[in-house]
């Protein structure tokens, strides 16, 4: 599970990206238009990557103990490539996202600043098909779709519920 930002602004508006897949067979990719997030000069792409589908409780490290990421960006103007990602990627395992898992939730410590940056390494041993992600995107529901409770009942004792629970 990942989240991408360009120059500090989030890319896309859906959650639990990219959706589950059997990583032994194929890896889903997603495409985003980041043109509105770019600025003149230097731009920064950041990714927060959790154990999620790859190594979290849902898969119990079947695919590996540490999540892996492949990201490729290509900037085109009038059909011509003017910039693209290269081999200068760096990463840190000491960022604010401590844990993120669909079953166990997320632990995020905003006080932690990524440190101990290391150069990313290309893993050529992975031999699976890349396929476009297919399926519905997970989105946070709009507030107008939330339902308000119809009634609230507060029980003060087991007697109020009409049960004895071992008494």
Regions found by a protein language model. Give the residues of each.
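Edge strands and adjacent loops of beta-rich recognition modules
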Residues: 126-167
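Accessory beta-strand-rich segments of carbohydrate-active enzymes
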Residues: 1-122
């Amino acid at each position: 599970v990942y989240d991408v930002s360009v120059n500090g602004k989030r890319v896309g508006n859906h959650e639990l990206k990219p959706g589950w897949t059997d990583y032994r067979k194929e890896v889903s990719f997603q495409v985003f238009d980041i043109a509105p997030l770019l600025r003149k000069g230097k731009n920064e792409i950041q990714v927060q990557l959790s154990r999620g589908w790859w190594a979290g409780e849902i898969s119990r490290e079947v695919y590996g103990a540490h999540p892996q990421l492949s990201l490729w960006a290509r900037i085109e103007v009038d059909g011509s490539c003017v910039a693209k990602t290269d081999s200068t990627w760096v990463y840190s395992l000491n960022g604010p996202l401590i844990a993120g898992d669909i079953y166990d939730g997320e632990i995020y410590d905003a006080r932690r600043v990524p440190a101990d940056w290391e150069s990313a390494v290309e893993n050529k041993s992975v031999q699976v098909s890349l396929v476009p992600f297919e399926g519905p995107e997970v989105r946070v529901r709009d507030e107008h779709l939330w339902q308000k409770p119809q009634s609230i009942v507060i029980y003060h004792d087991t007697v109020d519920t009409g049960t004895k629970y071992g008494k």
